[in-house]
């Protein structure tokens, strides 16, 4: 199964700047040129539509509030997902002309050039995430 997934990979790279209500995306084609950019609602339906448009693509996003569920969802849809460590992506967080579009573009370009520059992270499973939340809630109740 893994070999079949690897064969279906394309050189399409999607930078995805995650937001609470909307996500901004920037797509690089096989030649590394901008193919499309825009935004989509923070819904499974919109993410699934994007995934169907770029089967086998690599999607890169920074770790944040929505990255655990978004990354898992896109992986389930067959995309390769890279979650960048936001503390290590200097080119993005130190940029004077910061914008969602620019962040999405930089994520796509960095992933295309050398994904190790993003210092990729792996999120824990959904079950482990829920267990940690229960422990935090328990600790809060004990302190109260």
Residues of each region from the PLM?
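Phosphate- and other anionic-substrate recognition elements at nucleic-acid/protein interfaces
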Residues: 1-144
């Amino acid at each position: 199964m893994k070999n079949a997934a690897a064969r279906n990979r394309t050189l399409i790279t999607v930078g995805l700047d995650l937001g609470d209500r909307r996500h901004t995306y920037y797509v690089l084609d096989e030649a590394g040129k901008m193919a499309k950019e825009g935004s989509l609602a923070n819904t499974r339906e919109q993410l699934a539509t994007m995934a169907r448009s770029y089967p086998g693509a690599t999607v890169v996003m920074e770790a944040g509030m929505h990255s655990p569920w978004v990354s898992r969802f896109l992986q389930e849809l067959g995309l390769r997902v890279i979650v960048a460590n936001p503390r290590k992506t200097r080119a993005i967080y130190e940029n004077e002309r910061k914008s969602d579009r620019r962040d999405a573009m930089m994520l796509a370009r960095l992933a295309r050039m050398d994904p190790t520059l993003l210092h990729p992270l792996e999120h824990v499973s959904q079950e482990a995430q829920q267990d940690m939340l229960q422990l935090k809630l328990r600790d809060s109740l004990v302190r109260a």
